[in-house]
């Protein structure tokens, strides 16, 4: 049950996790930027239909 055989595993994993975090953040930003026009279009379309 000892993990002394993989000493260089945790720093690599932390860097990978940090990279994934930054990528997910940028993906979230880009997804919101691309989703806003669609949301505005849907809202205006719904208002036009309702009115």
Curated annotation (Swiss-Prot):
Segments carrying the region annotation (Disordered) are 1-22
Say which domain of life the source belongs to.
Eukaryota
Pfam family of the protein (one): MIAC
Where does this protein have coiled-coil stretches? Answer: none
What is one GO biological process annotated to this record?
regulation of epidermal growth factor receptor signaling pathway
* Extra information: Inhibits head and neck squamous cell carcinoma (HNSCC) progression in vitro. Also inhibits renal cell carcinoma progression in vitro.
Complexes and interactors: Interacts with aquaporin AQP2.
What functional role does this protein have? Reduces filamentous actin fibers by interacting with aquaporin AQP2 which leads to inhibition of the expression of SEPTIN4 and integrin ITGB4. Also inhibits the activation of the EREG/EGFR signaling pathway through interaction with AQP2.
Q: What is the official name of this protein in its record?
A: Micropeptide inhibiting actin cytoskeleton
Q: Mind giving the lineage of the organism this protein is from?
A: Eukaryota, Metazoa, Chordata, Craniata, Vertebrata
């Amino acid at each position: 049950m000892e993990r002394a055989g993989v000493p260089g595993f945790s720093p690599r994993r932390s860097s990978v996790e940090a990279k994934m975090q930054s990528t997910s953040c940028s993906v979230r930003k880009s997804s919101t930027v691309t989703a806003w026009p669609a949301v505005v279009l849907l809202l205006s379309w719904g208002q036009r239909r309702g009115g």
